[in-house]
Amino acid sequence: MRIVFDIGGSVLVPSKPDVEFIDKLSYELTKVSEDHEIAIVVGGGKTAREYIEVASKFNANETFKDYLGIQITRANAMLLIAALKERAYPQVVTDFWEAWKAIQLKKIPVMGGTHPGHTTDAVSALLAEFLGADLLVVITNVDGVYTDDPRKNPNAKKLEKISARELVQIVGKSTSKAGASTVIDPLAASIILRSGIKTYIIGKKDALRLFDVIRGKHEGTTVEP
């Protein structure tokens, strides 16, 4: 299979880099890459949001703040490249053609953000579409799609299986401002819908058993085309 992994920045760097988790995740990704072609996109997470918040105090515009966030995503991507060692393409990949070329070289391409207005969720979905991926795996700090934000509403229920169209409806009211944080952003959901990409949305626990996840055995949400 060809698989794209979308890894939230706050998963890797909750307040500071989670060295143990990054090490274990890189091992899982390396093992999966032995039997499958994989590509990775890393988000900016809490660190990017903090930088963007400070930039807002200086009246930076949304495009400037998007560029600032992109730099943080690429710093996080470099951390993962370091952990993946020789299995990774040695520098952060910045466009989809370069990602494709890295795969042909039997290396794992690791990307961050690319363009203002596109979250790394959207980059992941676009990359999966471009590469003709069989599967998109979204790793977040929320272990699936819920009826409401489980961090704010204790009565929110996890949805084990939904359609891509239902995903679009659920996330459709999310903000598109720089640094916005949702389980997946509306643009990414729309790309998943149009591309018919099977998607798993999982949390950190499942991220440490990726062989099970790619076979459909996980505790997150399956998004069917």
UniProtKB/Swiss-Prot annotation:
It comes from the Archaea. InterPro entries: AceGlu_kinase-like_sf, Asp/Glu/Uridylate_kinase, Uridylate_kinase, Uridylate_kinase_arch/spir. Its EC number is 2.7.4.22. Pfam families: AA_kinase (PF00696). Signal peptide: none annotated. It catalyses: UMP + ATP = UDP + ADP. ATP binds at G9, S10, G45, R49, T140, N141, Y146, D149. UMP binds at G44, D66, T114, H115, P116, G117, H118, T119, T120. One of its GO terms (cellular component) is cytoplasm. Inhibited by UTP. One of its GO terms (molecular function) is UMP kinase activity. PANTHER family: URIDYLATE KINASE, URIDYLATE KINASE PUMPKIN, CHLOROPLASTIC. Catalyzes the reversible phosphorylation of UMP to UDP. Homohexamer. Belongs to the UMP kinase family. This is Uridylate kinase. The lineage of its organism: Archaea, Methanobacteriati, Methanobacteriota, Thermococci, Thermococcales.
